[in-house]
Amino acid sequence: MDLGEFRNLIAAVRGEIGKAVQGQDAIIDLVLISLFAGGHCLVEGPPGTAKTLLARSVSAAMALDYRRIQFTPDLMPGDVLGVNLFNFQNNQFHLTKGPVFTDILLADEINRAPPKTQSALLQAMNERMVTIDGTDYSLGPDFFVLATQNPIEQQGTYPLPEAQLDRFLFKLVVDFPDRDTEIAILTRHASQALKSELRNAGIRPLVTRAALAEGRALIDAIRLDDTILTYIVDLVRATRSDADILYGASTRAADALASAVRVRAAFEGRDYGLPDDVQALLVPALRHRIILSPSAEIDGRTPDEVLRNIKNRVDAPR
């Protein structure tokens, strides 16, 4: 597979996912970029904005296994990872694997689980491995977490610590669809038959595991010349000296942004990254990795606004 064929494959995958998820083209793109980059996504949005449908549709189009965990305050690490259960027939312990042993894991309302459970998922995200009763178990190379949180209800939640937020390649903000898209969705849901059909929406599995590995090999070969790497570093360093930011982005953030730029370039059929790639991915890659200063918060500024100001201020290579 060459870059042209890969670009066409990704365009077809976008189309398949779009059969079920309408009006979220930019979000679909960023989820696919994260998946091919080997990262994870944190999705923030109100209930009823197709977050679960998005995860299920991506898994269907990519022919990957899918599991969902509803995070609650009483969820324990064993409920996520799995437990060793004693078998009285052979007097041995046997591992009962938890839902983390999958390809695409939807961690629904992740901020409702206590920190102990969140940290168990953190190891899986970071190392693609889990430890159960002192024994390490590997997860698949395609393991991908799409975690959601509700920005409206914050009572009884456990905010994700900075270390865990930093493990997400992107933080995506999902909003309600526009008027025309909402009408189209309601039209599609007009009958019960169409509602049941929406569960799979006729999505064809287009990407085999071999094709996924082949695509990642193409991405690894994408060139980022010194001017692009310097531009990424300058943008990240600018977050550390901005008056509106209390804590700026880390070196890991720069590395994550560079990885995402390579994927976006490959999606466009290019073997090189452009400043446009960096600018398009800057906000979703960094909005969860900076902490605004108290004065900026009092003035009503948002991470997105501050990052856009930095993007406008730092000169892009020509």
Give short role names for the model-derived ranges.
Residues A61-Q89:
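AAA+/P-loop NTPase substrate/partner-engagement loops
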Residues P99-N126, Q155-L165, F176-I185:
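Conserved AAA+/SF3 P-loop NTPase catalytic/coupling segment centered on the Walker-B
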Residues P77, L81, T157-I222, T230, ...:
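Conserved AAA+ ATPase core "coupling" helix
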